[in-house]
């Protein structure tokens, strides 16, 4: 059968039909391979192929590529099609080049030459195909190769309009890739004057190009302002003298009008020329007037085009912010849209009014719509519109309406969508502080926030209320009374407990005179919440209790009993254990004067910009008004690590060292040892009061997932560790605590790590004093450098002698497993599974199926994997129960990429763990570290 000539390629149609009729993936691949073999034989055959046949086979290759198969031949045949004079053949050649050829191809020079030939052609269709190909590829090489030809085509008087339009868009694409492609000087004026072109396509494309050029070099292209205003005036004035043929549903050239209005927003003000400014204001007034006219058509296209121009004009009015009458008119027009039936229109009106509210000229006009905006916040069905209403209320708030707006936002917060609650909390907190004339009102607002939306109250918010109360003496008593009453609620949020604990610890004495809030009542109220709180809050409450001992000596015994409780002194949380032991010892050995000095009230905080405002700016950059700044105290945040460790105590207790654990570890400035008999004797006789036992606790295995805590403990010695890792470097602080009543002599910790292993993991250890006094604690510093991948971990052998006893030796594995040098790596599903497939070799993967050691705890497993050092990737695996992670192990020699997949089976109570990495030894080691941890 003779081949069909023309655009209808029968062979291509038959091939596509065959592919669609394939019943399986294997059948499809078989048919594709057969076709590839046929095409390859045709290209290599002795018979010369004509243009039609080349086009047909190149189309088939293109279709196969689009099915997801790699194509490694046919490129030369596609390049040959570029020299054809037939449009259909040249078009297919350019299509193949645009899709399959990359800039590193050996054929790129030949392709560039073919494109240059077409750019010089007198056939505008060929020129357009070449320009479209350049724009589609848009590479640096293309920009450099055609940096002279395309600008010439754009400004040449001989160039056809359709080619000029393509040249402008092509130049815009290349400018985004290579901003230096467009020459300056005389070219600037010639490009700007394209705004006067009579062809709609040319002037629209040129406006987009000029807008991009202005953003890079506004001064050089400032001449475009007068031309843009003039062109806009000719379009929107009543006579419609310009572009009459381009009216879209009774709106003249709406797309060009929008582009011109956006172009003018690059300058502020657009012009100093009073004539041009007057003409621009006339245009803007005309657009606002037309918005008031009855619609000329009921079709949605008319209203969409009309409103698009209107909103862009309003954006320009807001940007200029210099014409009060225009700003007020714009505000009134937007106010009409607030009750429009179109949801999108209401959203855009609220968004634009947010900007108008920040202008001194239109702020009062915006406030007139307050009731409608409040109604929108409460009644709108679309959450995004409600969000915009909240934003507008925040923007229009000032001293005159702050209390009303804050109260309305608090009322709405109880039923607000979860997605906007956190942001609303921040905004209410900022408004309450910024416009508070009475700080008792501010305290009430923040406590209400915590009561209504405690889960969404960030640390910055409750830190801030504490700082405000500390800095303002007149509100301290009220705050103590109010928070005491709030804590009496049956269901009390943990953030309320934090605020209450802190404020009562500082100012509880101000309300202690009332029998209803006597010292013991305050203490029992707080302690009733203790066991319901997290470790961080418990630590804060312990600090409050030691403050109570200073404020209310009469309840000292009750509080000391709490410190002595087994759950505190023997807490699994090292911070709670340390605080309980230190605070108990402090309350026992310190005199009243020393206690008062150590636990005196927190001083006032110096001021800085609000951290709450900074959080809000981070959440919605560009949406927080510039005049929203409030001043804030610059202070250590009152968190559980330092809130009650005030002044002298920060110098006199080792808990204060804990408050700056990172700086101590990095600065290597921790004192070598504490001296028995002083306030920093953190162990003292405490352990004699606890229930002694002879159990040995070795937590080395748990440190696969954590960096800080108690590493080892027996009746004689406690070893704690704090560590930090960055890429292939690590630093550890080991803390040795003597639990006995006598000194430990000949105390020598020795690193146990072979010379061969030291070539892969270099560990340096600093010596310590040979005597560890009774009840004392000393620190030893280690540094580690991962040079190459290694197995296992070094250990430390501690030898010592107890006075009058036999020599002792303790061996503990150090938390220096290979996973400590992980860097978490973010990636999307496509990247993850592509990498997963690439690491599918037998030597690159390890898989274990094992029984869970305890009932399946998926949140716990996720926490463990996060602590392991890899990045836990959400929404990657189709099964939501499965966990996938990615990370890079840093060594001096190389980086090792690792992927992990953990698949739980709830019915069988089993896990399947799969590890893939580029090194077999690392794969096996990671698998071995994890397999017995779940």
Swiss-Prot record:
The keyword Iron does not apply. It is found in: Cell membrane; Membrane, Coated pit. It is a peripheral membrane protein. Keywords: Cell membrane, Coated pit, Endocytosis, Membrane, Protein transport, Transport. GO terms for molecular function: clathrin adaptor activity. The keyword Transport applies. Residues 636-645 have a biased composition (Polar residues). Residues 646-663 have a biased composition (Low complexity). Adaptor protein complex 2 (AP-2) is a heterotetramer composed of two large adaptins (alpha-type and beta-type subunits), a medium adaptin (mu-type subunit AP50) and a small adaptin (sigma-type subunit AP17). This is AP-2 complex subunit alpha. The gene is alpha-Adaptin.
């Amino acid at each position: 059968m003779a081949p069909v000539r023309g655009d209808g390629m029968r062979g291509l149609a038959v091939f596509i039909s065959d592919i669609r009729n394939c019943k399986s993936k294997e059948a499809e691949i078989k048919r594709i391979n057969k076709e590839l073999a046929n095409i390859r034989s045709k290209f290599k055959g002795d018979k010369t192929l004509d243009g039609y046949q080349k086009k047909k086979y190149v189309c088939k290759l293109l279709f196969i590529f689009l099915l997801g198969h790699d194509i490694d031949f046919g490129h030369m045949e596609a390049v040959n099609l570029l020299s054809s004079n037939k449009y259909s053949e040249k078009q297919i050649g350019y299509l193949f080049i645009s899709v399959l050829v990359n800039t590193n191809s050996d054929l790129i020079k030949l392709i560039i030459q073919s494109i240059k030939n077409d750019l010089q052609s007198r056939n505008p269709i060929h020129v357009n195909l070449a320009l479209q190909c350049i724009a589609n590829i848009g590479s640096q090489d293309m920009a450099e190769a055609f940096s002279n030809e395309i600008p010439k085509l754009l400004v040449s008087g001989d160039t056809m309009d359709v080619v000029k339009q393509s040249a402008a868009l092509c130049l815009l694409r290349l400018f985004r890739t290579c901003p230096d492609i467009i020459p300056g000087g005389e070219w600037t004026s010639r490009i700007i004057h394209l705004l006067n072109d009579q062809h709609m396509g040319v002037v629209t494309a040129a406006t987009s190009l000029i807008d991009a050029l202005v953003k890079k070099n506004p001064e050089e292209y400032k001449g475009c302002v007068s031309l843009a205003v003039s062109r806009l005036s000719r379009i929107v004035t009543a006579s419609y003298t310009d572009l009459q043929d381009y009216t879209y549903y009774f709106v003249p050239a709406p797309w060009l009008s929008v582009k011109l209005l956006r172009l003018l927003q690059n300058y502020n003000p657009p012009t100093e020329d009073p004539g041009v400014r007057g003409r621009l204001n006339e245009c803007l007034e005309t657009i606002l007037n037309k918005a008031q006219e009855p619609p000329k058509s009921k079709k949605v296209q008319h209203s969409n085009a009309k409103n698009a121009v209107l909103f862009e004009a309003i954006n320009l009015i807001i940007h200029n912010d210099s014409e009060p009458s225009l700003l007020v008119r714009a505000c009134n027009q937007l106010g009409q849209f607030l009750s429009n039936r179109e949801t999108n229109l209401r959203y855009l009106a609220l968004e634009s009014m947010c900007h108008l509210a920040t202008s001194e000229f239109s702020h009062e006009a915006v406030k007139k719509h307050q009731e409608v905006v409040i109604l929108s916040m409460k009644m709108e069905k679309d959450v995004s519109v409600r969000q915009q209403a909240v934003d507008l209320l925040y923007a229009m708030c000032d001293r005159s309406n702050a209390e009303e707006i804050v109260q309305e936002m608090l009322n709405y917060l109880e039923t607000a969508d979860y997605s906007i609650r956190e942001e609303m909390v921040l905004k209410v907190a900022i408004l309450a502080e910024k416009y508070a004339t009475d700080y008792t009102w501010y305290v009430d607002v923040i406590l209400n926030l915590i009561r209504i939306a405690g889960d969404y109250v960030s640390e910055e918010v409750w830190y801030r209320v504490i700082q405000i109360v500390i800095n303002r003496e007149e509100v301290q008593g009220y705050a103590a009374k109010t928070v005491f009453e709030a804590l009496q609620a049956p269901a009390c949020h943990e953030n309320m407990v934090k605020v209450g604990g802190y404020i009562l610890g500082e100012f509880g004495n101000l309300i202690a005179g009332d029998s209803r809030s006597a010292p013991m009542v305050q203490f029992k109220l707080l302690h009733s919440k203790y066991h319901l709180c997290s470790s961080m809050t418990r630590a804060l409450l312990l600090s409050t209790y030691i403050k109570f001992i200073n404020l209310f000596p009469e309840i000292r015994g009750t509080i000391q009993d709490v410190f002595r409780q087994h759950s505190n002194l023997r807490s699994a949380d090292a911070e709670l254990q340390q605080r309980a032991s230190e605070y108990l010892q402090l309350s026992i050995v310190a005199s009243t004067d020393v206690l008062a000095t150590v636990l005196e009230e927190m001083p006032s905080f110096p001021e800085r910009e609000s951290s709450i405002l900074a959080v809000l700016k981070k959440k919605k950059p560009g949406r927080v008004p510039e005049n929203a700044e409030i001043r804030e105290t610059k202070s250590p945040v009152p968190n559980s690590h330092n809130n009650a460790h005030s002044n002298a105590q920060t110098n006199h207790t080792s808990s204060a060292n804990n408050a700056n654990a990172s700086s101590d570890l990095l600065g290597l400035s921790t004192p070598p040892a504490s001296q028995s008999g002083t306030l920093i004797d953190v162990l003292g006789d405490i352990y004699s009061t606890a229930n002694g036992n002879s159990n040995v606790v070795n937590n080395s295995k748990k440190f696969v997932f954590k960096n800080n805590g108690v590493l080892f403990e027996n009746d004689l010695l406690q070893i704690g560790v704090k560590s930090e890792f960055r890429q292939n470097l690590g630093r550890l602080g080991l803390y040795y605590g003597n639990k006995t009543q006598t000194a430990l002599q000949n105390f020598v910790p020795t690193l146990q790590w072979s010379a061969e292993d030291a070539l892969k993991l270099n560990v340096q250890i600093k010596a310590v004093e040979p005597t560890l006094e009774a009840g004392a604690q000393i620190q030893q510093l280690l540094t580690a450098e991962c040079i190459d991948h290694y197995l296992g971990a070094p250990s430390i052998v501690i030898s010592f002698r107890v006075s009058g006893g036999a020599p002792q030796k303790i061996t503990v594995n150090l938390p220096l497993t290979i996973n400590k040098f992980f860097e978490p790596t973010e990636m999307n599903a496509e990247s993850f599974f592509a990498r997963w497939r690439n690491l599918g070799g037998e030597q690159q993967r390890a898989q274990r199926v094992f029984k869970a050691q305890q009932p399946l705890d998926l949140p716990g497993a996720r926490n463990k994997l996060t602590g392991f050092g890899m990045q836990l990737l959400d929404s990657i695996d189709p099964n939501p129960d499965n966990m996938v992670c990615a990370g890079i192990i840093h060594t001096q020699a190389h980086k090792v990429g690792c992927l992990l997949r953990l698949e739980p089976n709830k019915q069988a109570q089993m896990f399947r763990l799969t590890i893939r990495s580029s090194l077999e030894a690392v794969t096996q080691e990671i698998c071995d570290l994890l397999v017995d941890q779940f």
